[in-house]
């Protein structure tokens, strides 16, 4: 069976079953959050841009935020046969893309996105089994639902599976 590649945009999410592949490009300060049920081989990817929906007045796109995007992704995965007790997660992104002498919350959005993501996953009881976060470089990721591998591609920092 040929693998179908689903592209996930910014503030977007997609779900696939094996042998589907989920990919997102341009993870700078954004975080790509993969959730996976290794028994049902159901995978989901959400590309979040901001940590919390309650801190922004225009929060109509719930997939933009870690706190709401992860929960929506789980709902969609359950419709495809995933079991919430078996979910594991992998993370990539959360970079500090712009250097600044001012250590402000606005400039540390990547770090804040990673922290919020980890808080939400902990609250939901979903373990993080691998991550490639931080740094000052962008990432493109591909998740293979057939075997649970996450390919992380960077410019100048190599390519690796986590």
Curated annotation (Swiss-Prot):
Catalyzed chemical reaction(s): L-glutaminyl-[protein] + H2O = L-glutamyl-[protein] + NH4(+)
Coiled-coil zones: none
Keyword list, A-Z: Chemotaxis, Hydrolase
Keyword field contains Hydrolase: yes
GO biological process terms held by the UniProt record: chemotaxis
GO function terms (MF aspect): protein-glutamine glutaminase activity
InterPro entries referenced in this protein's UniProt entry, alphabetically: CheD-like_sf, Chemorcpt_Glu_NH3ase_CheD, Cytotoxic_necrot_fac-like_cat
EC number: 3.5.1.44
Role summary: Probably deamidates glutamine residues to glutamate on methyl-accepting chemotaxis receptors (MCPs), playing an important role in chemotaxis.
PANTHER family: CHEMORECEPTOR GLUTAMINE DEAMIDASE CHED-RELATED (PTHR35147:SF1)
Family listed: Belongs to the CheD family.
Protein name, per record: Probable chemoreceptor glutamine deamidase CheD
Protein species of origin: Caldanaerobacter subterraneus subsp. tengcongensis (strain DSM 15242 / JCM 11007 / NBRC 100824 / MB4)
Gene that encodes it: cheD
């Amino acid at each position: 069976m040929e693998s179908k590649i689903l592209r996930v945009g910014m503030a977007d999410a997609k779900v696939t079953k094996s042998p589907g592949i989920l990919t997102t490009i341009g993870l700078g300060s954004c975080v790509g959050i993969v959730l996976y049920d290794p028994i049902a081989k159901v995978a989901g990817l959400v590309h979040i841009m901001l940590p919390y929906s309650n801190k922004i007045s225009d929060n109509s796109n719930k997939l933009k935020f870690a706190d709401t995007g992860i929960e929506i992704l789980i709902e969609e995965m359950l419709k495809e046969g995933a079991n919430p007790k078996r979910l594991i997660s992998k993370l990539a992104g959360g970079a500090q893309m712009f250097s600044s002498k001012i250590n402000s919350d606005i400039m540390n959005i990547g770090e804040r996105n990673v922290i919020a993501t980890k808080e939400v996953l902990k609250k939901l009881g979903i373990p993080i089994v691998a991550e490639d976060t931080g740094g000052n470089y962008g990432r493109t990721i591909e998740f293979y639902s057939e075997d649970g591998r996450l390919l992380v591609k960077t410019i100048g920092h190599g390519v690796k599976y986590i």
